[in-house]
Amino acid sequence: MKVVEVKHPLVRHKIGLMREGDISTKRFRELAAEVGSLLTYEATADFETETVTIEGWNGPVEVDQIKGKKVTVVPILRAGLGMMDGVLEHIPSARISVVGIYRDEETLEPVPYFEKLASDMNERIALVVDPMLATGGSMIATVDLLKKRGCTSIKALVLVAAPEGIKALEAAHPDIELYTAAIDKCLNEKGYILPGLGDAGDKIFGTK
């Protein structure tokens, strides 16, 4: 599995701001979208382009346009919604495919409860967004679902990843790509990433 830890200074700075314990909901939400935007820029760097001729202001002009499969952004509910706008900033025409999965706090296992995917998943590149890759369970379950629906090109975008989650995701889906703003130290006994960001969903939505 291709794993990319994006070490751009802007990404490192913004993730550092998100680690502040007393950060406001507004600020955390803004930063989640901003880092999501920067990760999208990195994850789409290998998209193929083709040269086409258009009618410019002073006659025909050759320009580059992205070719190949179209994109669907796949936020994992609910926290993934906080990164979605960052993707759409660059790819406003992307279809939105939603997957609802929550983690059982006792077993730490993923529990799926909702899905609404683009009808042509086999013809699209899926950019799956979820702030935290902890145990990897939710991401693995989401990729399982996307593959069952015919999607063969999948990139996962997360703010923070734990080594345990990366290992589990690679074992289950070695053919996908992972882009993360930070690879943290480990998981604690409750399955939270250390040092991590805390509960990203609560911080994005202002709940506890």
From Swiss-Prot:
Pathway annotation: Pyrimidine metabolism; UMP biosynthesis via salvage pathway; UMP from uracil: step 1/1
Co-factor binding comment: Binds 1 Mg(2+) ion per subunit. The magnesium is bound as Mg-PRPP.
The record ties this protein, via Pfam families, to: UPRTase (PF14681)
Entry EC number(s): 2.4.2.9
Q: Per its UniProt record, what Gene3D superfamilies does this chain match?
A: 3.40.50.2020
Keywords carried by this UniProt record: Allosteric enzyme, Glycosyltransferase, GTP-binding, Magnesium, Nucleotide-binding, Transferase
Q: Which cofactor does it need?
A: Mg(2+)
Q: How is its activity regulated?
A: Allosterically activated by GTP.
**A GO biological-process term:** uracil salvage
Q: Is Magnesium among the key words of this record?
A: yes
Statement: the UniProt record of this protein carries the keyword Magnesium = yes
Fetch the InterPro entries from UniProt.
Answer: PRibTrfase_dom, PRTase-like, Upp_B, UPRTase/APRTase, Ura_phspho_trans
Query: Which GO-annotated molecular functions does the record name?
Result: GTP binding; magnesium ion binding; uracil phosphoribosyltransferase activity
Q: Which reaction does it catalyse?
A: UMP + diphosphate = 5-phospho-alpha-D-ribose 1-diphosphate + uracil
Binding residues annotated for uracil, in chain numbering: I193, G198, D199, A200
UniProt-annotated binding residues for 5-phospho-alpha-D-ribose 1-diphosphate: R78, R103, D130, P131, M132, L133, A134, T135, G136, G137, S138, D199
Entry function: Catalyzes the conversion of uracil and 5-phospho-alpha-D-ribose 1-diphosphate (PRPP) to UMP and diphosphate.
Similarity annotation: Belongs to the UPRTase family.
User: Can you name this protein?
Assistant: Uracil phosphoribosyltransferase
